[in-house]
Regions:
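P-loop NTP-binding/switch modules centered on Walker-like glycine-rich loops
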Residues: 195, 199-203, 207-285
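A short, proline-enriched helix->beta-strand linker immediately N-terminal to the Walker B motif
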Residues: 188-192
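Short catalytic/signature loops enriched in Gly
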Residues: 4, 13-20, 33-40, 45, ...
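ABC ATPase NBD coupling module
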Residues: 38-43, 84, 97-113, 139, ...
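Conserved ABC transporter NBD signature motif
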Residues: 88-96
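Conserved ABC ATPase signature
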Residues: 169-173, 177
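Conserved ABC ATPase "signature" region
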Residues: 95-96, 147-164, 270-274
């Protein structure tokens, strides 16, 4: 059951402005894994998302970045309620949807949609493109059959595809075209918030920029708000207004995209930035190599979860967990020694 923990220290990092489309307060998503009949005592808890707090303003793009397994996709799926939260609050358009039942959640969910990572897996191969895009309209009973068909043709044109593609099947399209179909489907109900889960990572580099530019144009045309999830910080910084950096289920840094890329404060963010190639051949960037593997979310380290891999960790980092604190206006860092 979701609980209200809005008064905990890290909740100070959230902007509770009326302009927020989304507020996430101390959100947790834990998975309980049993040991089976022969290992009943080996049950464990996977702390996929652990005490995450942030807000997203109307019309902005908030980027979530981190290594694979950090919990960013689980966070997005919990926000849209594909998973039920273990604890915490999800405030969408001013309403707490954390513990709503299916019938009550229905009207809120139509205003938040998701673009999935792999268009080959997220589009039903047995359905035509027209049926795929029209499915949300059918579920909510919007418009007549003719109006739905016209809406589908309009959405295809909006994402840069020909309107006569409605009777074709997903396998007849390239990866970039299939992702455009997925984007069209996400727009069918005129959402306020679109959660973009690694929307370009499965595409060729030559196609990624086209899809990113399309998302930007659609945001301007339809007043969309994006939660943009990716493992590539360069991509996230390119499209986002603000960025949150996740590590092992927790947010370790939040700030304006330019601030995060030019003045990163958390050692983990600094390591991610150092891996981004520099376009200027006359300029070099010192690469920060992190040693060791990411610890298991079933047994996270004590204190700061990053301390086993941190190049500047000290003794107290393994004992006391750092909370997000504001080091400069709008720039929050969970590190004892960030300045």
């Amino acid at each position: 059951m979701a609980v209200d923990t809005a008064q905990t220290p890290e909740s100070n990092s959230i902007d509770t402005s009326a302009d927020n489309v989304l507020e996430v307060r101390n959100l947790k998503k834990h998975f309980y894994v049993g040991g089976g009949f022969l290992a009943r005592n080996s049950a464990m808890t996977i702390q996929a998302v652990d005490d995450v707090t942030f807000s997203v303003k109307r019309g902005e793009t908030f980027g979530l970045v981190g290594e694979s397994g950090c919990g960013k996709t689980t966070l997005g799926q919990t926000i849209i309620r594909l998973y039920n939260p273990t604890a915490g609050n999800i405030i969408f358009n001013g309403a707490d949807i954390s513990s709503l039942k299916a019938n009550d959640l229905r009207n809120h969910r139509r205003k938040m949609q998701m673009i999935f990572q792999d268009p080959s897996a997220s589009l039903d191969p047995r359905m035509t493109v027209g049926s795929i895009i029209a499915e949300p309209l059918n579920i909510y009973g919007i418009g007549s059959r003719e109006e739905r068909q016209e809406r589908v043709r309009e959405l295809l044109r909006v994402v840069g595809l020909n309107s006569y593609f409605t009777n074709r099947y997903p396998h007849e399209f390239s990866g970039g075209q299939r992702q455009r179909i997925g984007i069209a489907r996400s727009l069918a109900l005129n959402p306020d918030l679109v959660i973009c889960d690694e929307p370009v990572s499965a595409l060729d580099v030559s196609i990624q920029a086209q899809v990113l530019n399309l998302l930007r144009q659609l945001q301007q045309d339809f007043d969309l708000t994006y939660l943009f999830i990716a493992h590539n910080l360069a991509v996230v910084a390119h499209i986002s207004d603000r960025v949150g950096v996740m590590y092992l289920g927790k947010l370790v840094e939040i700030g304006e995209a330019k601030t995060i890329t030019e003045q990163p404060k958390h050692p983990y963010t600094q390591a991610l930035i150092s891996a981004i190639p520099v376009a200027d051949p006359g300029r070099q960037r010192d690469r920060i190599i992190l040693e060791g593997d990411v610890p298991s979310p079933a047994n996270p380290p004590s204190g700061c979860r990053f301390h086993p891999r941190c190049p500047v960790a000290r003794a107290d980092c393994s004992e006391q967990e750092p909370l997000l604190r504001e080091v400069t206006p709008g720039h929050w860092v969970a590190c004892h020694y960030a300045e």
